[in-house]
Each structure stands twice: as structure tokens, then as C-alpha cells.
């Protein structure tokens, strides 16, 4: 049963105090950062982008890839001088990396000036832990070994005013052999549907147009319930919310994307025609070593079923290169999978060792081979992305306007229902509007277009 968040301590802080949160990693971490920001602002802190101005700095860490950990350790080293100059600065490390016992100990040993270390299971305790640091003038290391249910009603400070992340579940039960997530995020726990629906209704009242439902595997939503309420049921309920324009979700596990879910996403008016389905590899031998729980044939049949019901569906994926034991033949099967599916885009990455996972003990592929293969994969996917986007030329697509582009204030940017980025001229259109755009140019990573007068 969800417990209510009660640790506010608003009067303990001064409004002039500033905070900075730097996040690494996935969308779940971005959403966690919004909760951290919400609690800090409840305590009277205001955001800043300047480290030297901050009274509290939180590094919200990731441990999925070694590069993210290296960035955190490098940043901590650079923050040492700032901590010496500002001894009252509260410096904290949280998130997936600090949830690992070895990493937390390493932080404490190598960076003793860090004031606060906590993990993924107790971020709602942040106000109390800050108060403890200030009152006792000593560091707090508090990493819960296991999850203790779901805490609702945590304050949230969202970065976006149009689109919102909405977490529907936490944890993962899949234990892919390369992945550390189940060890740092815990077992799967689903939020109650009424809590999710209430949150989305509040977002709509605040002017939000689009929500993205988050979970390590959203298709597993509800499997921990005693009744038969599942992800498809939740989508149908959300689709009925008045005023909401668009619904997205991620991430889906190909093994659990069943026919009922396909029928629901095909018929729901607000669920966008974009499905992120991480394949990871195209070789059955590698998929088995990864413990993915499906075959290449199952994956391709799933894609066929989705496109049969949703012909204009956009399919994206995660693809890994260099898993231990991957041969050139295995890699060729991944390339062939990409050619068959013709992803609109793909997040491609090189496998790197995660201590504590089964794959770390296997014979590794050389860095030289991994580097060569990832370049071949990227080149192939970029070509397919370009060809797919060029096919959009001449079509009129609905675009949710997000605002000015970062590089040119005369251009606006927005996204289609299939999650393609579109840039166009149209300064009269305010963010949040749905406009009809005729696509004039397809590029590998975006579409260019022009506003269709009166939407015709």
C-alpha cells in the first residue's frame, strides 16, 4: 500500500538557497531528478545552473554504462576545489551508481568531502537527510538494500510545460545477463492505476498535452497485482482522459508485447504510433546468452503484427554490439535484422562490462572489433533513417509545437505522433499547439516542413 510523503520541513530553509541537479542516464533518472527538484523547492531552494552559486549539488547517477560512472568520478574530482572554497556546500551522490554497495564505498573512500550518498529506493527521504547533514555536520550514507514499496505524493518540479514523464512502475524482473538494472532498481512494483490516472488528470489541468508512461518494462505493469488489471487496461483508461492529446510509453520488452496490447494501441485514439522495442541483437545465439527470453523469429513476427494493425507505425530500438562471444556471423544477423525491420531510428551502443552481471565473466570481444562493428551498424541505420524520412516528403503530418529550435530562434520545432522531430518556420504558433505541417525535406535525424494554412 502506497505511503504518503510527509517529510517537508519547509521552514528549515531560506528562500535564497540554490540547488543544482546533474543527471546521467535514462528517462527514469530524468524523472527521478524532477522529484529531487520538487523536494528541494519545497524546502525553499531555487534552481541554478552555476556550480559555484549552488548551496547543494546532487549528482543523479547511472551505472548502465562505464562512461557514465567515469563522468561522475571525474566531476567529483573537479568539485573538490569548490567544496574547499565553500565548506557549507552540501554535495550529494544518488541514483543507480550509488545504489551499488561497492560504488558507494568507493565514493566515500575516494571523495570523503561528499556529504550525502543515497540510492534509488529512498529518494523520498531527501529532506530528512539534508536536515540530518545540516544538524549534525557530518556525512550521511544511507543506501537501502531493498525496496520498501512505492511512495506517492512526492513533490515534482517538471522541466517541460507541455510533455510529462509519468512513472507507472519501478524495478525489473528480467535479469538480462549484461544488465545491472534489476540489482539497483529492485523487483517490479506497479503503481495503483487510480494514482497514475489522478496524476495525469492533474497534468492536463496544468496544461500538459502529452504524457510518456515510464517503466523498465511497461508491458509487465500489473503483474504484481492480485487482479488481472494489466498495461492494456491502463492504456484504455488513460485514453479516456478528457483534454489529453497524446500518450507514449517506454520501454517495452518484445517478449511481453502481446496481441491484446497490439489491439489496444491500434484502437486507442491518443496512443501515439511509435513503439520502442529494444532488440539488442539479431542472433538467436546471442539473444539466448543475453537471457532476453525471445528469438529473432518472435521479434520479427511481433513487428509484422504491429505493422499489420498500425501500418504507419514508427519502430525504434536499442541495439548492442560486441556482447561477449559475438562472432562476425552473429553481427551479420544483427545487420540483417536492421535491414528487415527498417527502424526509424536506433540507439546503438557498444557492450561494456558491468561488474556483478553474468556477462562480465564471459570471454570478451576486443575493443578494436567492437569499434569497427559499431561504425558499420551506425552507417547502415543512418542510411535507413534517411530513406524512411525521405518517404515522408510531401505528406502532411500533425505536429505538437514544442518551441524555438536551440540554434535558430526563427525556426520552431515539434514532434509528430510517430516521434519524428520536425523543424519549420511559423513564429505565430505558440508551444502546445497542434499544427499541420507539410514535409519538404527528410534528413537522417529530422524532418523539415512548412505550415499548411488552415490545416488543409
Swiss-Prot record:
Residue spans crossing the bilayer: none
Localization: Cytoplasm
Positions bound to [4Fe-4S] cluster 1: 26, 62, 96
Primary residence: cytoplasm
Pfam families with a match to the protein in the record: Radical_SAM, TRAM, UPF0004
Keywords: 4Fe-4S, Cytoplasm, Iron, Iron-sulfur, Metal-binding, S-adenosyl-L-methionine, Transferase, tRNA processing
Catalytic function, reaction form: N(6)-dimethylallyladenosine(37) in tRNA + (sulfur carrier)-SH + AH2 + 2 S-adenosyl-L-methionine = 2-methylsulfanyl-N(6)-dimethylallyladenosine(37) in tRNA + (sulfur carrier)-H + 5'-deoxyadenosine + L-methionine + A + S-adenosyl-L-homocysteine + 2 H(+)
Top enzyme category: transferase
Residue ranges constituting the Radical SAM core domain according to the UniProt record: 158-387
UniProt keyword Iron-sulfur present: yes
MF terms (GO), sorted A to Z: 4 iron, 4 sulfur cluster binding; metal ion binding; N6-isopentenyladenosine methylthiotransferase activity
Domain MTTase N-terminal: 17-135
Domain TRAM intervals: 390-453
A GO term from the CC aspect: cytosol
Coiled coil ranges: none
Highest taxon, organism lineage: Bacteria
EC number: 2.8.4.3
Binding site for [4Fe-4S] cluster 2: 172, 176, 179
Cofactor dependence: [4Fe-4S] cluster
Cofactor binding, note field: Binds 2 [4Fe-4S] clusters. One cluster is coordinated with 3 cysteines and an exchangeable S-adenosyl-L-methionine.
Annotated family: Belongs to the methylthiotransferase family. MiaB subfamily.
Subunit and partners: Monomer.
Function per UniProt: Catalyzes the methylthiolation of N6-(dimethylallyl)adenosine (i(6)A), leading to the formation of 2-methylthio-N6-(dimethylallyl)adenosine (ms(2)i(6)A) at position 37 in tRNAs that read codons beginning with uridine.
Annotated protein name in UniProt: tRNA-2-methylthio-N(6)-dimethylallyladenosine synthase
Native source organism of the sequence: Desulforamulus reducens (strain ATCC BAA-1160 / DSM 100696 / MI-1) (Desulfotomaculum reducens)
